[in-house]
Amino acid sequence: MSDKHVDIDTVKYISKLSKLKFTDNEAKKLAGEFEAILGHFETIDKVDLSDINVNEFDEVNTEFRKDVPKVFEDKKKLMQNVKSLRDGAIEVPKIIE
């Protein structure tokens, strides 16, 4: 790969958004791992698929389970590990700036 896509500052920025903390060494290691992953995508992107019929596998039959809602009776048990409640709802920290 000629250009770096992920540097230490990018890792630190993403970790801040996701509320994770990494040392400089960890951030450097992660930047290298992300670069390797993106390198694999670049390799895959170079594969010639012009002779492949992309619609060949459209008839996959996936059976889904029924999505049946159930009432959860034990609200106290459900809320026992919640850090913060507001008006009976779970309050979570803002993550989008």
Curated annotation (Swiss-Prot):
Coiled-coil regions, chain positions: none
EC number(s) given by UniProt: 6.3.5.-
Domain of life: Bacteria
Entry-linked InterPro entries: Asp/Glu-ADT_sf_sub_c (IPR036113), GatC (IPR003837)
Residue spans crossing the bilayer: none
EC category name: ligase
GO function terms (MF aspect): asparaginyl-tRNA synthase (glutamine-hydrolyzing) activity; ATP binding; glutaminyl-tRNA synthase (glutamine-hydrolyzing) activity
Catalytic activity: L-glutamyl-tRNA(Gln) + L-glutamine + ATP + H2O = L-glutaminyl-tRNA(Gln) + L-glutamate + ADP + phosphate + H(+); L-aspartyl-tRNA(Asn) + L-glutamine + ATP + H2O = L-asparaginyl-tRNA(Asn) + L-glutamate + ADP + phosphate + 2 H(+)
Record carries keyword ATP-binding: yes
Key words of the record: ATP-binding, Ligase, Nucleotide-binding, Protein biosynthesis
GO terms for biological process, alphabetical: glutaminyl-tRNAGln biosynthesis via transamidation; regulation of translational fidelity; translation
UniProt entry tagged with the keyword DNA-binding: no
Protein's job: Allows the formation of correctly charged Asn-tRNA(Asn) or Gln-tRNA(Gln) through the transamidation of misacylated Asp-tRNA(Asn) or Glu-tRNA(Gln) in organisms which lack either or both of asparaginyl-tRNA or glutaminyl-tRNA synthetases. The reaction takes place in the presence of glutamine and ATP through an activated phospho-Asp-tRNA(Asn) or phospho-Glu-tRNA(Gln).
Subunit structure as annotated in this protein's UniProt entry: Heterotrimer of A, B and C subunits.
Family, per entry: Belongs to the GatC family.
Protein name: Glutamyl-tRNA(Gln) amidotransferase subunit C 2
Native organism taxonomy: Bacteria, Bacillati, Bacillota, Clostridia, Eubacteriales
Gene behind this protein: gatC2
